[in-house]
């Protein structure tokens, strides 16, 4: 694969107003994508966004670029990332474009693409788009220019899709649910899904103003959700991130239920119903407690590199259907083609309803191991992880933790940092082992 100049692992992302998140680059990107995507099909591209104020600027620029290349744009407004994947498929569009920086602050934004089947664009297509970005723009004949339209019922379509994944003979009547939408793209979707399934819903983080996305709310900051759940006597709390592809949950006692626990609950329920389709894909950061709990059920488990993109790659490689990250990216491939926070939360709620069990009871089946994370800054160009002394200490720690824990040492890709992670069923042992490795890293 050729080295990328503009596209990262999750499209193009950065600070608004600084290259590449500028209106002129978005215009050129729309044009380049349009030139590559133009086929004999409908020549239509869906464009969705989260609630950042910069989304207006970027969608207009993208639309102009697409039109110059002869493709029409269909705007769906603020919609979750997984909704764009779904709608791109159902509208038979050439592609879908999402304008979002996910869980980042409002002053960041990004642009990523879905293929016509709602999956990440193939590498060769991204490379072809990149190659065109360095060429001068041209414009199709006036009669061939693209148009723009707005799809007014996109939210309703996606709400119905989400509800359709919930068991037809079940409902959420009698449940009190607090829904935190991070002032992001799920603000007009998730509360309505839960209400229409019968739940009593308390909303927080559903008043976006363009600047407050992910601000002290949502999947990356659940303190407000925990407080409201406990004070209101709710059964469960749901926290989505800015673009709706992550989910964190809170039980009735205010305890956090993370992606690893959510993944286990969904896997166990799929096993019981005969719909597991193989095993489960986690990541290098998935808690060992998840691995142990799945092993007790004889469910195969494998680890991908950190990032939902790599989880998806492993799922496809193995032909499995379920994977995710402890950060709350949960992929259920027989429901949607990408991580979907609303779908994942409905899977857990369906398990709660089927067994008349609280989230606390369901999550208790995954006793998470204490995890110690320490970042160690290093000087100079040499990677301390290549030191024989560090390797020897790491090997000794691994031997002591055998069967009871594990270590993960990673060099940051963006900073001169070594990330030391140790987890063990004995928290004190995890802490002492981590400190031992840190000292070795600092000394080399």
UniProtKB/Swiss-Prot annotation:
The keyword Isomerase applies. GO terms for cellular component: cytosol. Binds 1 Mg(2+) ion per subunit. Activated by phosphorylation. Its cofactor is Mg(2+). Disulfide bonds: none annotated. It catalyses: alpha-D-glucosamine 1-phosphate = D-glucosamine 6-phosphate. Mg(2+) binds at residues 102, 241, 243, 245. It is an enzyme of class 5 (isomerase). InterPro entries: A-D-PHexomutase_a/b/a-I, A-D-PHexomutase_a/b/a-I/II/III, A-D-PHexomutase_a/b/a-II, A-D-PHexomutase_a/b/a-III, A-D-PHexomutase_C, A-D-PHexomutase_C_sf, A-D-PHexomutase_CS, Alpha-D-phosphohexomutase_SF. The modification Phosphoserine is found at residue 102. One of its GO terms (molecular function) is phosphomannomutase activity. The active site is at 102 (phosphoserine intermediate). CDD domains: GlmM (cd05802). Its EC number is 5.4.2.10. One of its GO terms (biological process) is carbohydrate metabolic process. The keyword ATP-binding does not apply. Keywords: Isomerase, Magnesium, Metal-binding, Phosphoprotein. Catalyzes the conversion of glucosamine-6-phosphate to glucosamine-1-phosphate. Belongs to the phosphohexose mutase family. NCBIfam families: glmM (TIGR01455), PRK10887.1 (NF008139). This is Phosphoglucosamine mutase. It comes from Actinobacillus pleuropneumoniae serotype 7 (strain AP76). The gene is glmM.
